[in-house]
Regions:
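N-terminal targeting signals for export/organelle localization
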Residues: 1-70, 74, 222
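Sec/Tat-exported extracytoplasmic proteins
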Residues: 66, 90, 115-118, 143-146, ...
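Short loop/turn microsegments at loop-to-beta-strand junctions
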Residues: 68-69, 91, 187-189
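A short beta-strand-turn-helix
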Residues: 71-91
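Short active-site neighborhood of thiol/selenol oxidoreductases, capturing the structured segment around
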Residues: 84-111
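Structural microenvironment flanking redox-active thiols in thiol-disulfide oxidoreductases
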Residues: 106-163
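Thiol/disulfide oxidoreductase modules built on the thioredoxin-like
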Residues: 159-215
């Protein structure tokens, strides 16, 4: 399956799951291509812009909110993890991979800032879409650099595929280079789950930490 087919499928799934403007659905999907060395540094959007359209709180809302999909994988300590164990705490769920050169580290840094600014308990959950390289020890080393108490999850190929499908996340490995190195094209959104386990927001790449804080405050009742 080509990258275009994957991107089309991801856009269709996202559009079916969340009421957001089509331009934001496309921006979320197309910006993920920057994780690939063959992808563009910038993506052209309707109107000729080279950056994603501004994101507002209204653009991100699941209407209505719905129970977050199941997420049962292995954490960076090699222990079984169930998203349900975080009930009572807000969570920001992001699918990415440790070899991502740009979008993933940018997103995680922004989520770290947002979580610290929010000032109330919130867990950032990083789910790999590259389990072949992202073992539990590899994820631990990667997330430890952020010094933010992130939860990192991995699993078998089948387990990751099941989780990604449940969350409407698309991903695909790019062709490897002569040294066996490869990049991944993937959905680049962050998912906000409230303390009752409800999926509240689909936050496109490029949303500011201030917006994320605002969404957290709304989801927590202030």
């Amino acid at each position: 399956m080509g990258t275009g087919a994957v991107e089309h499928g991801v856009a269709r799934k996202i559009a079916a799951r969340v009421r957001v403007p089509r331009v934001l659905v496309l921006a979320t999907v197309l910006m993920a291509a920057a994780c690939s060395p063959s992808g563009p540094a910038f993506t052209a959007y309707p109107g000729g812009e080279l950056t994603p359209p501004p994101v507002t709180a209204a653009d991100t809302v699941y209407d209505p909110a719905r129970p977050a999909p199941e997420l049962k994988l292995t954490d960076q300590d090699g222990k079984a993890f169930d998203l349900g164990s975080l009930r009572g705490t807000m969570a920001l769920v992001y699918f990415g991979y440790t070899h991502c050169p740009d979008i993933c580290p940018t997103t995680l840094a922004d989520l770290r800032t947002a979580a610290a600014t929010f000032g109330k308990p919130v867990k950032v959950v990083f789910v790999t879409i590259d389990p072949a390289r992202d073992t539990a020890p590899a994820i631990r080393a990667y997330l430890d650099a952020y010094k933010a108490g992130f939860i990192g999850l991995t699993g078998t190929d089948a387990e990751i595929a099941t989780a990604a499908k449940a969350w409407a996340v698309g991903y695909e490995a790019e062709p490897a280079d002569s040294n066996g190195n490869y990049a991944m094209t993937h959905t680049s959104a962050t998912y906000l789950v409230d303390a009752s386990g409800q999926l509240r927001n689909h936050i496109p790449f490029g949303a500011s930490p201030d917006l994320v804080v605002s969404l957290l405050r709304t989801a927590s009742g202030g």
